[in-house]
A protein has these predicted regions:
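Structural signature for solvent-exposed beta-strand/loop edge elements and short helix-capping sites
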Residues: 3-227
Length: 227
């Protein structure tokens, strides 16, 4: 093992020829780049690669990667997850989930598919986003970009929406909804070719409907205002 890498374990088998440690009990692997918590799997101490099972956790800075099976390469920072993936950003208060996905620590790129979900809980209410495929790119310590594809649905107490694809960049705080988007905000419903939602401190400031705009306001049980 490298000087700055330590494996603490309840039970393990270590092959002195292959330099592979088979983990058979609660274990912690500590290095300069982060910490791994696992109870079953193996760790190649020469190539810094591992297979981590049973909802193991890979912690790197403010990110935590969790999954049923994680193929992890510490040198490249790549973690590929099969089953119950969660990528938690403790600084930005967001979580990316799916049945399959991966995360690259060095580029800040994350991908999730198969029941993919994104949760944003930095404010008082949580935003729930679901799509077939989700991508999250961490631009820097402050900004990130979210892309959602196919069957997009999102919900928060002050807004709900559906569309085919969506993009949100926290740098300009604009959420773009593409292909038959529908947005509900309290008693209002918006429809158009594309909807751009301008946010201010995670609340809707205004929405811009681009082409084929339709707006409806629910007045009471019998009346609607339409534009």
């Amino acid at each position: 093992m490298y000087k700055r890498q330590i494996l603490y374990s309840d039970t393990l088998h270590y092959d002195t020829e292959s330099k592979v440690a088979t983990i058979l009990g609660p274990s912690v692997i500590v290095s300069d780049s982060g910490t791994i918590h696992t109870s079953r799997g193996w760790y190649d101490t020469v190539n810094n690669t591992s297979l981590l099972l049973d909802q193991s956790q890979v912690e790197s800075g403010e990110k935590i990667l969790i999954g049923d099976s994680i193929f992890y390469n510490r040198d490249t920072g790549m973690g590929e997850v099969y089953g119950n993936m969660s990528l938690i950003d403790t600084a930005q208060h967001v979580t990316l989930q799916g049945e399959y996905g991966y995360y690259n620590e060095q580029t800040g790129y994350a991908f999730a598919t198969d029941s993919a979900r994104f949760l944003e809980y930095s404010q008082g209410d949580t935003l729930f986003l679901h799509a077939d495929t989700l991508q999250m790119v961490t631009v820097d310590s402050v900004y990130r970009e979210i892309k959602a594809y196919y069957g997009v649905r999102f919900y928060r107490i002050d807004m709900q929406g559906v569309c085919d694809s969506m993009q949100f960049n926290t740098r300009d705080s604009v959420l773009y909804m593409y292909t038959e988007p529908v947005l509900w905000n309290e008693q209002y419903q918006l429809y158009g070719d594309t909807i751009a939602i301008y946010m201010n401190d995670s609340t809707i400031e205004y929405a811009h409907v681009i082409q084929f705009a339709f707006a409806a306001q629910h007045v009471d049980s019998s009346y609607y205002n339409q534009l």
